[in-house]
Structure formats: C-alpha cells, structure tokens
Amino acid sequence: MAYLKVSGTKIVDKDGNEVILRGAGLGGWMNMENFITGYPGCEFQIRAALADVVGQEKSEFFFDKFLEYFFTDADAAFFKSLGLNCIRLPFNYRHFEDDMNPRVLKPEGFKHLDRVIDICAKHGIYTVLDLHTAPGGQNTDWHSDAGTHIAKFWEHKDFQDRVIWLWEELAQHYRDNTWIAGYNPLNEPTDPYQTRLIAWYDRVYAAIRKHDPHHALFLDGNTFASDFSHFGDAEKRWENTAYAIHDYSVFGFPAAPEPYVSSEAQRRRLRRSYEKKREWMDARGLCVWNGEFGPVYARREYEGDLTDSINEERYRVLKDQLEIYNKDRLSWSIWLYKDIGFQGMVHVSRDTPYMTLFRDFLAKKHRLAIDAWGADDSAVRHVYQPLIDLIKQEVKPEHQELYPAPVWKLSDRVGRLARNILVSEFLVREWAEHFRGKSTEELDAIAKSFAFENCLHRDGLNKVLTDNASLVAQGA
C-alpha cells in the first residue's frame, strides 16, 4: 500500500485516483475536552485534582483505562460500517513531553496512539494526526489546555521550538505508516499578528520533511481555521499540502439567529460562509480539507419535549452542509465521534457508572453554562449582563473589539473569562471529589462507561453521514 498524496485540488492514491476522506474527529480522547466528557475547565486541571484526591497511581490508572476503553476494535468496526474511511486523531502534547522536562520524549505517549492507528488500519480506515494542544496554548480556547484566553504559544519562541521538536519525533516514528493520511501540525491557531503562524508553518514543514518526505500535511488557517488572507504565496514553499478549514454554522447551535428551515436564503448563507473560508485556496487551485464541522444536539434532560424538533432542525443544517461539500467533492471530518450526549455520533448511556456518578454535577454545569461550546446561558445571563453593560459604557466603542473578534463578540469574551475560566476553576475540585474512596475496580468500571458497548447511537446523525458517504462513493 502506498501513501496518499495531494495533487492539485485532490487527494489521490498511488495511481492518481481521487480519494475523498469522509469521517470524524476522535475528540475528547487523547485531548480531553470539558463538554465532551463532562468535567469543568481544562484537562491539566482535572488531572492534577484527581491525583490530589485519589493519589497519583490511581489517577494514572483511571486515565489510562479511559484511553483504552474510549476507542476499541468495536468502535472501528461500527465506524467503518457507516461507510466512513478516515478518523482525525487529536492529541495533547503532554502525552509526549512534560512542561518540567521539555524535549525529553515520553515513549508511553505512543501506546494508545499506535494502538488506535493500527485498529483503524485493520478496518481500512485512514487516520490524520492532529496536534490539538501546544505548550502555552496555540489558541484562545479551552481545548488548547492552557487555562487562559491568551494564546501564549505565539509569544514564546521556546514553546514553538518544542513543538518543532515534537513533530520531528512524530515524523520519525510514523514515516513508514501508509494508513496515516497525513499530519495536521496545529489545530485552530489564533495568531493576532498573522505572520508568526506562517513563519512557524515554514519551520514545521521543513522539520517534518527532514524525516518524512511522504505524508501529506493539513495546515489550518488562522483564527480557528477560518482565515488564510495573510498566507500570500506560501503555498509555493509547501508541497504535498492540503489546507484545512473548520466550517461550523451558527444555525447548528443554540444561539442560531432563527429557526433553520432550509430556505434559499439560509442555504445561501451556508454556502457563502464556506466559500469565504476557502477563497485563498480556490484562487490558487489548492486542495481543501474540512477538518471540523457539525451541529450540537438537544438532550431530553434539558430541552424536554422540544428535543426531537430541535434535532431534526440540526439534521437539516447538516444535510445542507454535506450537499455543498458533495458538489465540491470535499474531504471532511465531522466533529465528533463520541461524547456524553451533546454532539457525538455515539454517546455514553445515562445508565453507566460515569453518568450516574456525575448526573447532578452535569446538570449544574449546564445550568451555570460553564462550558463555552454550544452554551445556553439563559439561566445565568442576568448575572453577567451588568459586567457587559459596564464595559460597553466605560470603554470607547473602537476599543471594544479585541482579537479574535469578530469570532468573539464582547459578550463572548466576558463569558469565556467569567464563566468558562473563573467559575469553572472553582468546580474542578468538586468534579474530582466524586472519585474519593473509589477502589481500583470501581475506577475501572467508571472508565469503562466510555466503551462502545456502553454507548448509544445517534441514529439520525449517523444516517445523514452514511447517506452522504454513499453519495460521494457513487460520484453523485
């Protein structure tokens, strides 16, 4: 078997035949996220808190079993049965390097990544390696696992150097694996000055190519993979490279401006948002990969009788997005495969030990809107509105927009700092205390809640994906 490669606007096999990658991201696994697995704040915070409550040995046991159960042969078989052929694998740099011991490789970091890559290969599924978290945080969000809203990765050359080092290690380790479709060196960068990202891409491209001339690279645009406007003629320096957009639609979230009825105007808005992200690539005849997209879904414990109607609306959004992608023969990776019930193709049953243990805590999280992703802040909006009003009153209008505006509005920034960082921080210990006194056997059972056999399927979502995967396969 030969490597996939980028040729013009397409991904092709060794014979030059087009390969359209259709799949999902394995978010919440080797890069945990609060809304995916139900904790507050950032992964580094809960790992430290759990070690403090149950001890380092039991904490490491729990997280290792979590990684083991989260994706197994059964998951890969199910994924393949849907007609999908690629999984994006987000991972945290901390699996391979410690902040207090930089540039010293942790070989155990490869344990689960190798395992899942091999399982996927066995089932004929390609993988894309996605560095989702970098030292200092490469973006302003929780999923860069930095605990702040400032992307310090761009402020410190040493942080950048460490990731160059890490990709050299990864390239040497994986250079001969042809089931890896390519490397996604940095997820959703947010460089306020734009130019530092391009300079870093030049460096990581050279570092990877020094060890691995074969694998394709998938480079995210700036500002959450939405903006290539400052890339200039950089493509002339990067061979075998595709460019990654993340095409989330506001219609797929609780803050949608209006109900989505698939009107001509709404479909036109979907198309225009997507086309704007890929303008730079289209002007140059370059390959585009949609590395993330997808709605979130209502849950009966929160939305009650409105759940089904809300979700049918979200499926309409997804269908219309995929229709656009199919016409362009676009490779895509929906976000995401597995979670606790908000966005995943499969989700942990509410009857499992994990969901039973955290039922009341998850309800509190939802009420306080401490996760940023798809938050419904209606129950606490009155608490934060005075702060928003104060800023609007006291800060000149021309100074109210701070990067990454307009992606973040003023109210979003207040929510990120006050709810998603500050209040979340106070709930980290409460999350960890749920594990106090648990035996090794109980910790294993809690972790096993995430195993495929303990998950439910979001059939409406999976049918949409399967239908569209088959359309692409037929050349529709």
From Swiss-Prot:
One of its GO terms (molecular function) is beta-glucosidase activity. It is an enzyme of class 3 (hydrolase). GO terms for biological process: glucan catabolic process. It catalyses: Hydrolysis of (1->4)-beta-D-xylans, to remove successive D-xylose residues from the non-reducing termini. GO terms for cellular component: cell surface; extracellular region. Its main location: secreted. The keyword Iron does not apply. Optimum pH is 5.5. Stable from pH 3 to pH 8. Catalyzes the hydrolysis of xylo-oligomers to xylose units and plays an important role in xylan degradation. Can also perform the transglycosylation of xylose and alcohol. Has no endoglucanase activity. PANTHER family: GLUCAN ENDO-1,6-BETA-GLUCOSIDASE B, PUTATIVE-RELATED. Belongs to the glycosyl hydrolase 5 (cellulase A) family. This is Beta-xylosidase. The gene is Xyl5.
